[in-house]
UniProtKB/Swiss-Prot annotation:
It holds the Pfam family TsaD. It comes from the Bacteria. InterPro entries: ATPase_NBD (IPR043129), Gcp-like_dom (IPR000905), KAE1/TsaD (IPR017861), Peptidase_M22_CS (IPR017860), TsaD (IPR022450). It comes from Rhodopseudomonas palustris (strain BisB18). This is tRNA N6-adenosine threonylcarbamoyltransferase. The keyword Cell inner membrane does not apply. GO terms for molecular function: iron ion binding; N(6)-L-threonylcarbamoyladenine synthase activity. Fe cation binds at residues 121, 125, 315. Its EC number is 2.3.1.234.
């Protein structure tokens, strides 16, 4: 049963390499307030390996999560009995970490007789803009992270239609792989952005993948390969070579992304009418160059551009708590038997077009 009363929800996030917990208030008018938001990044643990090691991540979640939840509750000035619900990210993500967070959420819910909300990590990103702004449905979401690159029509809580997706590398994944091949430290995305700012984007004629296609899908694998080929040709690389390669790669990725979003917004209008906004979410949305490109896309499309603060674009507990609060307001709770999921489609009824059946577009 739906309720219009205010709620206090604890959110737990452990799907990748951030161990996070937060408490969020959802008021009866639908507005939100963050009471606490504690995030521990495991970057230093994974940096020697050049990427996230699932076993290390899961063990760190086990070691850290209880203390982080305690800090989140203390900062919010609440006890567990004050909570209206406990929201835990139940996927998609690295299954070891997902199990840690969801099991902890279940334990709290069971001991304190509090409703459990098993949150789709992607839905949490999709709904985060409504935590920080008075945003009404429907809106067009560009979700870009290390594991996902999607254009999604957000029609309501639990109601999502994917308009476009990557058929190979996610955008964050491509940025990280380019950084690694150029010898830049982990995490690679911010390093590529920093190097690109000092580079000449016009030095290399990199391809613009999928440009001009009628569908709104993405592909970055070929662009990544083009960067690798140029880097091999120039080896050994001088610092300016690295800067120029990063600038050329980022410019090509942004031009392709802008084109894909123009198409995605057109498809959105044809199917659902005008969106209330173009919204960006996910860790890649913290990139300032990407933010600028998206702002121009929204301007050209005649719609407003909205994006959460950078701290709410990357993985955090507040987004999980908020998604839980949004679902709780509609009376949507979950059984303690809910199973963790390594893969969990945001749009569960999607049918992958035949030409993309053997690509990552199906996930």
């Amino acid at each position: 049963m739906a309720t219009d009363t205010a709620s206090l929800v604890l959110g737990i996030e452990t799907t990748c390499d951030e161990t996070a917990a937060a408490v969020v208030e959802r008021r009866s008018d639908g507005s939100g307030r963050i009471l606490s938001n504690i995030v521990h990044s495991q970057i230093e643990d994974h940096a020697p390996f050049g990427g996230v090691v699932p076993e290390i991540a899961a063990r760190a979640h086990v070691d850290l999560l209880d203390g982080i939840i305690a800090r989140a509750m203390q900062q919010a000035g609440l006890g567990f009995k004050d909570l209206s619900g406990v929201a835990a990210a139940a996927g998609p993500g690295l299954i070891g970490g997902v199990i840690v967070g969801l099991t902890t959420g279940k334990a709290i819910a069971l001991v304190h007789d509090t409703p459990l909300i098993a949150v789709n990590h992607l839905e949490a990103h999709a709904l985060t803009p409504r935590l920080t702004d008075a945003l009404q449905f429907p809106y067009c979401l560009f979700l870009a992270s290390g594991g996902h690159t999607q254009i999604v029509a957000v029609l309501g809580v639990g109601n999502y239609v994917r308009l476009g997706t990557t058929v190979d590398d996610a955008m964050g994944e491509a940025f990280d792989k380019v950084a690694k091949m150029l010898g830049l430290p982990y995490p690679g995305g911010p390093q590529v952005e920093r190097a690109a700012a000092a580079g000449d984007a016009a030095r290399f004629a990199f391809p613009r993948p999928m440009l001009g296609r009628a569908d709104a899908n993405f592909s970055l694998s070929g662009l990544k390969t083009a960067v690798r080929n140029e880097a091999s040709r120039l080896s050994p690389l001088e610092p300016q070579d690295v800067n120029d390669l990063c600038a050329g790669f980022q410019a090509a990725a942004l031009e392709s992304t802008a084109d894909r979003l123009h198409v995605g917004l057109r498809i959105f209008r044809e199917r659902f009418g005008a969106p209330h906004a173009l919204v960006a979410a996910g860790g890649v949305a913290a990139n300032q160059a990407i933010r600028g490109a998206l702002q121009q896309v929204a301007l050209a499309a005649g719609t407003q551009f909205m994006i959460p603060p950078p701290a709410l674009c990357t993985d955090n507990g507040a987004m999980i708590a908020w998604a839980g609060a949004e679902r709780l307001a509609l009376g949507l709770t979950d059984s303690l038997e809910f199973a963790p999921r390594a893969r969990w489609l945001l749009d569960a009824n999607v049918i992958t077009p035949a030409q993309f059946a053997n690509t990552r577009a199906g996930f």
